[in-house]
Amino acid sequence: MSVDAATVRRIAHLARIAVTEDEVPHLQGELNAMLAFVEQLSEVDVDGVEPMTSVTPMQMKKRADVVNDGEIADQVVANAPSTEDHFFLVPKVVE
């Protein structure tokens, strides 16, 4: 696959990036180089290779999905200048 100058301009327009006419040939070369690299990756034989999500073996820590109050309501409102029943009190701004 090859990217032409019109495609570079269209990509720039869709991405809302201002690109001058002088920059188009350089960006065209950069995009073509990226696509060539992706094409090389598609040629790699990965038969029998297990998919992985990380380069280091790890297991996700699981916890019970339990609803609680966080047990820190007092700490949260401690920084507020004025509170009532664990709610922040603010001055009335609309009549």
UniProtKB/Swiss-Prot annotation:
Keywords: ATP-binding, Ligase, Nucleotide-binding, Protein biosynthesis. Coiled coil: none annotated. Its EC number is 6.3.5.-. It comes from the Bacteria. This is Aspartyl/glutamyl-tRNA(Asn/Gln) amidotransferase subunit C. It comes from Rhodopseudomonas palustris (strain TIE-1). It catalyses: L-glutamyl-tRNA(Gln) + L-glutamine + ATP + H2O = L-glutaminyl-tRNA(Gln) + L-glutamate + ADP + phosphate + H(+); L-aspartyl-tRNA(Asn) + L-glutamine + ATP + H2O = L-asparaginyl-tRNA(Asn) + L-glutamate + ADP + phosphate + 2 H(+). Belongs to the GatC family. One of its GO terms (biological process) is translation. Pfam families: GatC. One of its GO terms (molecular function) is ATP binding. Heterotrimer of A, B and C subunits. Allows the formation of correctly charged Asn-tRNA(Asn) or Gln-tRNA(Gln) through the transamidation of misacylated Asp-tRNA(Asn) or Glu-tRNA(Gln) in organisms which lack either or both of asparaginyl-tRNA or glutaminyl-tRNA synthetases. The reaction takes place in the presence of glutamine and ATP through an activated phospho-Asp-tRNA(Asn) or phospho-Glu-tRNA(Gln).
